[in-house]
Swiss-Prot record:
It comes from Methanocaldococcus jannaschii (strain ATCC 43067 / DSM 2661 / JAL-1 / JCM 10045 / NBRC 100440). This is Uncharacterized protein MJ1475.
Amino acid sequence: MKKLIAKTKEELIEKIKECENEEEIYINLELDRDVAIALLESCEPKKIYLPKSKYKRSSKKIIKALEGVDVEVIPIKAKTGRPTNVDKIIKKYLDKKPKEIAEITGINIKTVEYHYYKLKKKEKQ
């Protein structure tokens, strides 16, 4: 999947024109007529991913028109915040208690508890 991230519509269209044939494309701006035409002319994608907030603001007529030419528009939840390695570290010690993990790793006990119980909950599902 190719990620096309731009601040303005014009910048996004320039990036779309540069891309080759891509099956899946992520766009961080809302989908409008000009962007859709540029996508179909240069990339011919099968799937277009948009953040949920931008999907809601995109024209439903354009989304239906794209589905008419076998292009699927999919809303996804965009990742926010700074990524951390804490989950990876705590995953190694899931057999121990949060207090022991905090002592071993030197990570704050509250941070360990948050990630520990979040990972345990994921494990159950």
